[in-house]
């Protein structure tokens, strides 16, 4: 699995934002085929992650799985009947770059503004805290883990930021569910698996409240699950894609 938008026909990196300078345009698939002398199939990293969870993780046995990977950025993928939806350009699943009202006017790493990733990724959680309350450590920008540690200690300001990020995430999940109607929703990635505090009651409540605010009535009970494979998911999913 590779970060960025992978050309489904060639395996080249068709697009990557400024978080990954120099990655866009890399002929990954062709170069690996040449260097290894073997057949190579390249899939997006979160698409691989979703395949892993859908086939061998918490989504095993489910007809359709909507998976979001939340870390430095936010990616996603949709698996139905065992197949990941890549889209014509390979860009399907870039759910961090859907419009989010809570992010209105906030620049996104992709060069646009108002995207979910700008308020719900680990990087954005740190930035939001700094903008509202000042840096946790004056010597450097805050990151999501800093805010999580404060929240764990009962800090009301940190709890507010994490709640707002969770609500924005949940509301976007509700909108996506209205389009895709998945059997289950799976959350995974670095932010989710940093520790149990990311799955605290405050965070769970905010995600579910955001989801309930947007999902249609028949979708209100769609399970929102935490991925079970953690860092192994994209490795397992990449193998599943090749097979």
Q: How should these model regions be labeled?
A:
Residues 19, 90-91:
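Residue-level structural signal for beta-strand termini and adjacent loop
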Residues 6-12, 30-38, 55-62, 84, ...:
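ATP-binding/phosphotransfer module of carbohydrate and carboxylate kinases, centering on a glycine-rich
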Residues 25, 29, 40-65:
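Conserved phosphate-binding catalytic cores of ATP/NTP-utilizing and phosphoryl-transfer enzymes
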């Amino acid at each position: 699995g590779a970060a960025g938008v992978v050309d489904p026909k060639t395996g080249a990196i068709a697009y990557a934002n400024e978080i990954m300078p120099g990655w866009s345009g890399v002929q990954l698939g062709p170069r690996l085929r040449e260097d290894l002398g073997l057949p190579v199939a390249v899939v997006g990293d979160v698409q691989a992650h979703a395949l892993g969870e859908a086939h061998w993780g918490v989504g095993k046995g489910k007809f359709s799985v909507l998976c979001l990977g939340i870390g430095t950025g936010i990616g996603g993928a949709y698996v139905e009947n065992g197949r990941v939806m890549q889209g014509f350009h390979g860009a399907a699943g870039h759910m961090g770059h859907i419009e989010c009202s809570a992010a209105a006017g906030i620049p996104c790493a992709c060069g646009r503004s108002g995207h979910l990733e700008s308020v719900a990724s680990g990087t954005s959680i740190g930035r939001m805290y700094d903008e509202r309350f000042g840096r946790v450590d004056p010597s450097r920008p805050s990151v999501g883990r800093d805010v999580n540690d404060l929240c764990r200690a009962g800090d009301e300001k940190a709890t507010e930021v994490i709640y707002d990020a969770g609500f924005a995430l949940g509301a976007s999940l509700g909108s996506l569910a209205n389009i895709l109607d998945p059997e289950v929703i799976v959350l995974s990635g670095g932010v989710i698996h940093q520790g149990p505090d990311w799955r605290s009651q405050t965070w769970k409540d905010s995600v579910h409240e955001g989801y309930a605010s947007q999902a249609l009535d028949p979708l209100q009970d769609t399970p929102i699950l935490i991925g079970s494979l953690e860092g192994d998911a994209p490795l397992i999913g990449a193998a599943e894609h090749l097979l």
